[in-house]
């Protein structure tokens, strides 16, 4: 099976635990206003690789990855679901830690064939970094041109399967950096039993030059980048919302 790959980063340090071999998949149906990889949207082009090709390169440098592993990102890796499953299957057979960085956008429980593939994927995935773009359905649709009901359901599904979850959330002034949305996000993720980490990332405009090269208008032109202090502020609100959810769940359990 052939995978369409945009690029490979051999020394990734922000895409999962430890040093990572990071594979950027081609193709993404989301059109997030702050996307910094618009060159990955098109599912065509890039480099063609087999799972064996990628794992051979990983093996040639495996001493670097003793405390890390392989991360599939993009683009949206789930757009090449069959190839992703094959890659992770073969990686797990070699004892390699597998991490999926995804928006979960193609997940739907009501498709039995698709759900069976997701069940298989969960069996060979150690960690999922789920990027929740916006907790509010209407705002998510405006921000990413896709609904979020299936994405939030994917978070619940991952949790049901017992796979470790890291939540990622980008804060943008007047879009996601709004207290009641942050609290709502926290309340939602507070219900995830297998939540292991929360990354709150301040918006930056470093991807704007890629839009210019591709001849695409940058949706957030003029938007000011945020700071680490903004991220700390937002993270605190999210964690308070998560704590409240856990307290509410505990109270309900004690009343049963």
Kindly label every feature range from the protein language model.
Residues 55, 59-69, 78-201, 206:
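Conserved AdoMet/S-adenosylmethionine-binding subsite of the radical SAM
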Residues 75:
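Active-site beta-strand/loop signature of hydrolases that rely on acidic residues for catalysis
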Residues 2-14, 171-256:
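Auxiliary Fe-S-binding modules of radical SAM enzymes
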Residues 39-43, 141-147, 215-224:
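Short glycine-enriched, charge-decorated loop/helix-capping segments at active-site entrances
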Residues 1-24, 29-47, 60-66:
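N-terminal [4Fe-4S]-dependent radical SAM core
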Residues 46-56:
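Short cysteine/histidine-rich metal-coordination sites, predominantly Zn2+-binding motifs
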């Amino acid at each position: 099976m052939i995978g369409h790959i945009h690029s490979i980063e051999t020394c990734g340090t922000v895409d999962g635990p430890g040093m990572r071999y990071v594979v950027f998949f081609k193709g993404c149906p989301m059109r997030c206003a702050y996307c910094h990889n618009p060159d990955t949207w098109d599912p065509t082009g890039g480099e063609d690789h087999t799972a064996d090709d990628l794992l051979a390169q990983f093996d040639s440098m495996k001493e670097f990855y003793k405390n890390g592993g392989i991360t599939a990102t993009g683009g949206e890796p789930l757009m090449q679901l069959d190839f992703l499953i094959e890659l992770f299957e073969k990686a797990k057979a070699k004892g390699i830690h597998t991490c999926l960085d995804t928006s979960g956008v193609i997940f739907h429980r009501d498709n039995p064939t698709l759900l069976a593939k997701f069940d298989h994927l969960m069996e060979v995935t150690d960690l999922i970094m789920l990027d929740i773009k916006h907790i509010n359905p209407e705002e998510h649709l405006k921000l990413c041109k896709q609904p979020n009901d299936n994405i939030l359901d994917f978070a619940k599904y991952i949790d049901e399967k017992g796979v470790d979850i890291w939540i990622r959330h980008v804060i943008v002034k007047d879009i996601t950096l709004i207290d009641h949305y942050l609290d709502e996000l926290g309340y939602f993720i507070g219900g995830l039993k297998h939540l292991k980490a929360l990354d709150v990332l301040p918006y930056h405009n470093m991807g704007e030059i890629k839009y210019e090269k591709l001849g695409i208008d940058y949706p957030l032109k003029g938007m000011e980048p945020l700071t680490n202090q903004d991220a700390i502020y937002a993270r605190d609100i999210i964690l308070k919302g998560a704590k409240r959810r856990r307290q509410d769940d505990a109270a309900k359990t004690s009343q049963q």
